[in-house]
Each structure stands twice: as structure tokens, then as C-alpha cells.
């Protein structure tokens, strides 16, 4: 089975930002699997969150990115699975904390709430940050 660096999906509200992000990631030589949606026609965000979740669980990729209107619904839908730690990140600091303290495996972005000027910095920080373990591991065990 082919694996990817990142699996990504959006609803219709996040489609344009998703397209920009995919291009950015590919320029960084990262392999990206796009689960849709593939246009701005209205769709149901839980369907696309589930696609990324399933691909993470099936180990198609270790990291996922979801983009919705605000990202709230996407993060709720993704976090229904016990194997997923989806984090809605709005800036570099939240992206760093999501990985360092919570070992997040899905970055969630709100197309209408994230600053498009810093979205690449958010993604870079999320991808570069390693889980610190230690006391954070103990805390994660309490929510599994």
C-alpha cells in the first residue's frame, strides 16, 4: 500500500484554502493524498472528516489536515475516533502546543478564521514539532 506524508480534506468552505495548502506542501516535496472535496459545491463536512480519520487509522499517512468554515465541526467530527487527536489551530503557538503537548495527528484549520498570511507558518510548526512525552503522556492516557 502506498503511503503519503499527509492526507488532507475540506468541505466546500475550505476548498480554496485546501488547494493553496496542497500546492505549498507539494513544493516542499511532501506527498499529499487529497480526500476531497474537489469543488465549492455544498457538502457535509463530517463525510470528509471521516475520510481523513479512516486514512490515518489505516496508516495511509501519519498526519492529516482538515479545513472547514471555522474548523469547529471538522474537529468535533474527527475526534469521535479514539485514535485521533485533531486540534483546531489558529496560530503558530496553538499548532506547536497541539503537537508538543497533545501529540495531535490532525491539524484542523478554519478557512474563515485562520489568517491566510500565516497559515503556512502554522502548518510548518505543526509538522516540525515533536511530542514531548513525559507528563503529557500521562495526561493523554487519561483521555484514551
Swiss-Prot record:
GO molecular function, one term: intramolecular oxidoreductase activity, interconverting aldoses and ketoses
NCBIfam families: PRK05571.1, rpiB, rpiB_lacA_lacB
Gene3D superfamilies the UniProt entry points to: Sugar-phosphate isomerase, RpiB/LacA/LacB
Lineage: Bacteria, Pseudomonadati, Pseudomonadota, Alphaproteobacteria, Rickettsiales
Enzyme Commission number(s): 5.3.1.-
InterPro entries, A to Z: RpiB, RpiB_LacA_LacB, RpiB_LacA_LacB_sf
Active site: 101
Positions of transmembrane segments: none
Keyword Isomerase carried by entry: yes
EC top class named in words: isomerase
Entry keywords, A to Z: Isomerase
Organism for this UniProt entry: Rickettsia bellii (strain RML369-C)
Any one Gene Ontology BP term: carbohydrate metabolic process
Positions contributing to substrate binding: 12, 135
Family named by the database record: Belongs to the LacAB/RpiB family.
Name under which the protein is recorded: Putative sugar phosphate isomerase RBE_0278
